[in-house]
Amino acid sequence: ADPGPLQDFCLADLNSPLFINGYPCRNPALAISDDF
């Protein structure tokens, strides 16, 4: 069974020096309302 959709988002970390098949996700604890 799939877990709840609460964790089904990824904010791209555009400032990360890594680029692995796309941008890595930012720490969700650092998300603010302006990110959405």
Curated annotation (Swiss-Prot):
Keyword match Hydrolase: yes
The protein's Enzyme Commission number: 3.4.22.-
InterPro entries per record: RmlC-like_jellyroll
Keyword annotations: Hydrolase, Protease, Thiol protease
pH dependence per the entry: Optimum pH is 5-6.
Temperature dependence of activity: Optimum temperature is 25-37 degrees Celsius.
A biological process term (GO) from this entry: proteolysis
A single MF term (Gene Ontology): cysteine-type peptidase activity
Oligomeric form and interacting partners: Homohexamer, possibly consisting of a trimer of dimers.
Membership in a protein family: Belongs to the germin family.
Protein name (record): Peruvianin-1
Natural source organism: Thevetia peruviana
